[in-house]
Amino acid sequence: MFGISFSELLLVGLVALLVLGPERLPGAARTAGLWIGRLKRSFNTIKQEVEREIGADEIRRQLHNEHILSMEREAQKLLAPLTGQNPPQETPPPAAESPAPSVPTPPPTSTPAVPPADAAAPPAVAASTPPSPPSETPRNP
């Protein structure tokens, strides 16, 4: 944790034994342990609070950016008729629902619809048949 080896720890223990004596050393070790535990807990609490704030700030920043983007899109839609440009197509955000699959529409037919009255007679025969000439009958002079 701090890079303290066992020999350094042993040296600190011997100095504490010489300075405090055998009577006060257990109480001092207990007090030092409590202080170290409190410091660890407070550092962990501060660390969690900072991480929570960073996460909240990031979410707040993301929402702010999305709000700005939506306002820009609305402004472009409103200004598009004035500038003569087509408004940009809206693309859904990545987290949004996927668009419904498009159903292809059949191409329009190029032949005009036939009215029901003409449908009974074939149009090619009716239009191309010339009137029949009168049959020849003998003439009386």
From Swiss-Prot:
InterPro entries assigned: TatA/B/E (IPR003369), TatB (IPR018448)
Region Disordered, annotated ranges: 74-141
GO biological process: protein transport by the Tat complex
Gene Ontology MF annotations: protein transmembrane transporter activity
Highest taxon listed in the record's lineage: Bacteria
Pfam families xrefs: TatA_B_E
Subcellular locations according to the entry: Cell inner membrane
Keywords: Cell inner membrane, Cell membrane, Membrane, Protein transport, Translocation, Transmembrane, Transmembrane helix, Transport
Membrane topology: Single-pass membrane protein
Chief place where the protein resides: membrane
Keyword Ribonucleoprotein among record annotations: no
Biased composition, class Pro residues, residue ranges: 89-115, 130-141
Low complexity composition-biased segments: 116-129
Transmembrane segments: 1-21
GO cellular component terms listed in the entry, alphabetical order: TAT protein transport complex
HAMAP family: TatB
NCBIfam families associated with the record: tatB
Similarity comment: Belongs to the TatB family.
Binding partners and assembly: The Tat system comprises two distinct complexes: a TatABC complex, containing multiple copies of TatA, TatB and TatC subunits, and a separate TatA complex, containing only TatA subunits. Substrates initially bind to the TatABC complex, which probably triggers association of the separate TatA complex to form the active translocon.
Function comment: Part of the twin-arginine translocation (Tat) system that transports large folded proteins containing a characteristic twin-arginine motif in their signal peptide across membranes. Together with TatC, TatB is part of a receptor directly interacting with Tat signal peptides. TatB may form an oligomeric binding site that transiently accommodates folded Tat precursor proteins before their translocation.
Protein name as catalogued: Sec-independent protein translocase protein TatB
Species of provenance: Pseudomonas aeruginosa (strain ATCC 15692 / DSM 22644 / CIP 104116 / JCM 14847 / LMG 12228 / 1C / PRS 101 / PAO1)
